[in-house]
Amino acid sequence: MTTVYTLVSWLAILGYWLLIAGVTLRILMKRRAVPSAMAWLLIIYILPLVGIIAYLAVGELHLGKRRAERARAMWPSTAKWLNDLKACKHIFAEENSSVAAPLFKLCERRQGIAGVKGNQLQLMTESDDVMQALIRDIQLARHNIEIVFYIWQPGGMADQVAESLMAAARRGIHCRLMLDSAGSVAFFRSPWPELMRNAGIEVVEALKVNLMRVFLRRMDLRQHRKMIMIDNYIAYTGSMNMVDPRYFKQDAGVGQWIDLMARMEGPIATAMGIIYSCDWEIETGKRILPPPPDVNIMPFEQASGHTIHTIASGPGFPEDLIHQALLTAAYSAREYLIMTTPYFVPSDDLLHAICTAAQRGVDVSIILPRKNDSMLVGWASRAFFTELLAAGVKIYQFEGGLLHTKSVLVDGELSLVGTVNLDMRSLWLNFEITLAIDDKGFGADLAAVQDDYISRSRLLDARLWLKRPLWHRVAERLFYFFSPLL
C-alpha cells in the first residue's frame, strides 16, 4: 500500500511539473508581447494551479471550433464580394490629405478596398438626439435593419427604440438584432427578447457565456461593436451602447456616461454592412451579404463628401490592424494629437508613439475620466502618467461623468471615432470597429466636442503628481505589472 501511495505521489508530482513545463513552453512558443508573456509566467510560477487555469481560460484567443470554422468558410465569399465592390470605382477616393494618406494606404492594403467617398456625416453627442434620430430612421425604413450592440439596457428611451423596431418588423421590415451575451445580460433576462421575436425580429445572443465551455472558448472575448444599418444606406456607429444614461449604472458613483455617435448616409453603409454580415455568419452560420451601393443616391461627391475607411478587428479580421492604425495616426501627427478614451492601458508601442509625438514638438493631449467604473483599469492607467507627463503630454481628467467617448484627432483633419478603447482588450481581443475620416469639416466638429470635454476637465499638474502618496505609487506599479493581462 505504501509503495502504491509513493508511486501515485511521484506520478502526481511529475504530472504537476510536466503541466507547468508544458504551459510554459506554450507561452514561450506563442508570438506575443514580452511583458504579457512575463506576466503570465510570473502568475503561473507564484500560483501554479490558479495561473494555469486562468491561462487555459483566457490566456489565448479561442473563438471556439464552430465559430472558427464559420470564419474560415465565410472569407472566400467575403473576398469575392470585396473584389466585386471594386468595380464601383466612383465610390472610392483616389487621393487623401497628407496627414491621412499613410493610414488610408495601410487600410487599403490590409483590407482590400480604398476609402469610401461621397458620404454625409453627422456627429451626435446627446443620447436623446441619437435615439430620436434613430427612431425616425427606423420609422422610415423600407427594406432592412441590422443592429449590433455590446450593451442593450432596458429602460427609458431604449424601450422606445425597441418599440419602434418591433413596429417596423410588424410592417414587413427585415430586422436583425445581435447583442453580446455578457454585456446585454439584463436584456436577455427581461421580457424584451421574446417580445421582439414574436414581432418578427431575429434576435441573436452573441458569444453566449457558458461556463461549461470555459476552456473551449475565451469567455472574455466580447462582441464590442455598436452599429446600426438601415436600408443599406443609413448607418450609425460610435461609443454609445443602447442605454438611456439616466437609467444606466446609476449606483456606480461615476455619473452619467458621456458618449459620441456618428450618423452616416451614403456608400459607407455598404462597407459597414459587410462587417455585420461577417459577424452574423460567424454567430449563426447564415450568409447575408449586402447588395452593392446604389450609385444614384450618393449624397455628396468627392468635393463635399466625407471620405471614410471602416477598420474592423476581432478573430477572423486583419490581425492588429486597429493597433497599426493608431500607431500610424500618432506618427503622422505634425501639429497636434488629441485622444479621448475611458480606459487607458496602452501597449508599449502605442505609449512610445504618443510620447515620441510630444517629444518632437506635437501638442499631445489625452482626455480621461477622473472617476472610472473599473478600479483595475483606473489604477493601471495611472501607472503611465509619469512617463507621459515627462514627455510633455497634457493629461486632462474629465469631471462631468464617465467620459466613454473613443476618439482621436490628428492635425484637425484625420479623425478616428468608434468603439475602440486604448487598452489591451480592445486592441488585441474584442470585435471592434473604428471609422477613419479624412475631412477638415468633420475634424472641426470633433475638435469642438473635444474642446468641450477639456472645458469640463482638470489638467493634471506634473509637480503635484510627483507628490502623490507612496501607497498610490505601489498600487499603480502593481496594477501596471498586470496591465498586459487587462
From Swiss-Prot:
- InterPro entries attached to this UniProt entry: Cardiolipin_synthase (IPR022924), CL_synthase_A (IPR030840), CLS_N (IPR027379), PLD-like_dom (IPR025202), PLipase_D/transphosphatidylase (IPR001736)
* Keywords assigned by UniProt, alphabetized: Cell inner membrane, Cell membrane, Lipid biosynthesis, Lipid metabolism, Membrane, Phospholipid biosynthesis, Phospholipid metabolism, Repeat, Transferase, Transmembrane, Transmembrane helix
Indicate where this protein resides in the cell.
Cell inner membrane
Q: Which SUPFAM superfamilies is this protein grouped with?
A: Phospholipase D/nuclease
Could you name the active-site residues? H224, K226, D231, H404, K406, D411
* Gene Ontology, cellular component aspect: plasma membrane
The molecular function terms in GO held by this entry are: cardiolipin synthase activity
Recorded catalytic reaction(s): these are: 2 a 1,2-diacyl-sn-glycero-3-phospho-(1'-sn-glycerol) = a cardiolipin + glycerol
Annotated EC: 2.7.8.-
Domain called PLD phosphodiesterase: residue spans:
219-246, 399-426
- TM ranges are 3-23, 38-58
Keyword Repeat attached: yes
Q: What class of enzyme is it?
A: transferase
Q: Which GO terms describe its biological process?
A: cardiolipin biosynthetic process
Q: How does it sit in the membrane?
A: Multi-pass membrane protein
Under the heading SMART domains, the entry gives:
PLDc
Q: Which family does the entry's similarity section mention?
A: Belongs to the phospholipase D family. Cardiolipin synthase subfamily. ClsA sub-subfamily.
Q: Which HAMAP family match?
A: Cardiolipin_synth_ClsA (MF_00190)
Function field: Catalyzes the reversible phosphatidyl group transfer from one phosphatidylglycerol molecule to another to form cardiolipin (CL) (diphosphatidylglycerol) and glycerol.
This chain belongs to the protein called Cardiolipin synthase A
The protein's organism comes out as Shigella boydii serotype 18 (strain CDC 3083-94 / BS512)
